[in-house]
Amino acid sequence: MASLNGPLRVGIGGPVGSGKTALMEQLCRRFRDRYEICAITNDIYTKEDARILTVAGALPEERILGVETGGCPHTAIREDASINLAAVAEMRRRFPKLDLVLIESGGDNLAATFSPELADITLYVIDVAGGEKIPRKGGPGITRSDLLIVNKTDLAPLVGADLSVMESDTQRMRGTRPYVFASLREGHGADRVATFIVEAGGLR
């Protein structure tokens, strides 16, 4: 099902601990029986996120590739994406019929974005535990990503966050761009994210 232009590449960004790896796992589980898929993770000095996906059984080990970025993680997805482009090329070599590549960035700040050369669609994950004010802080991930995921809604009562305020701020910051409120550890909201990828990415 791969297109003549190669597989659909989906970039998943967001701060450390926001739930990027949880989203990767949920998406792998939903797509692995429908599409030829692989996952690429970015960590500064380790391959921990790749290990987590492997241990969780999200995909076969050979379909998960960990990239050690070193230094500043946003450089590897934006200013100099060569290390990730090489990882995509390696996975295409291993699996010539790839339909979908999920690329998880290393945890970074709200200003991190994916190079258009690397990702066709960008998802950005923030979490309720970071505080009710996070959506209104803005930044490219919040305002310009193709889909914003506000994760860990189950923690709202514990951190004193008002989800209605967060949703209002999200709508104000994003305009007509879509968003999903989710609790990814339980899988809540993951189906909506998967549907968005299929529809926005033109997967069949």
Swiss-Prot record:
One GO BP annotation is:
urea catabolic process
Q: Which residues bind GTP?
A: G14, P15, V16, G17, S18, G19, K20, T21
What does the UniProt entry say about where the protein is found?
Cytoplasm
Q: Which domain of life is it from?
A: Bacteria
MF annotations from Gene Ontology: GTP binding; GTPase activity; nickel cation binding
| Keywords attached to this entry | Chaperone, Cytoplasm, GTP-binding, Nickel insertion, Nucleotide-binding
Please provide one cellular component term from the Gene Ontology annotations of this protein.
cytoplasm
- Note one Pfam family from the annotation: cobW
Predominant location of this chain?
Answer: cytoplasm
The record describes the protein's role as: Facilitates the functional incorporation of the urease nickel metallocenter. This process requires GTP hydrolysis, probably effectuated by UreG.
HAMAP family per record: UreG
The entry assigns this protein to a family as follows: Belongs to the SIMIBI class G3E GTPase family. UreG subfamily.
Assembly notes: Homodimer. UreD, UreF and UreG form a complex that acts as a GTP-hydrolysis-dependent molecular chaperone, activating the urease apoprotein by helping to assemble the nickel containing metallocenter of UreC. The UreE protein probably delivers the nickel.
Family matches, as NCBIfam families: ureG
Q: What's the protein called, per UniProt?
A: Urease accessory protein UreG 1
Origin organism is Methylorubrum populi (strain ATCC BAA-705 / NCIMB 13946 / BJ001) (Methylobacterium populi)
Source species taxonomy = Bacteria, Pseudomonadati, Pseudomonadota, Alphaproteobacteria, Hyphomicrobiales
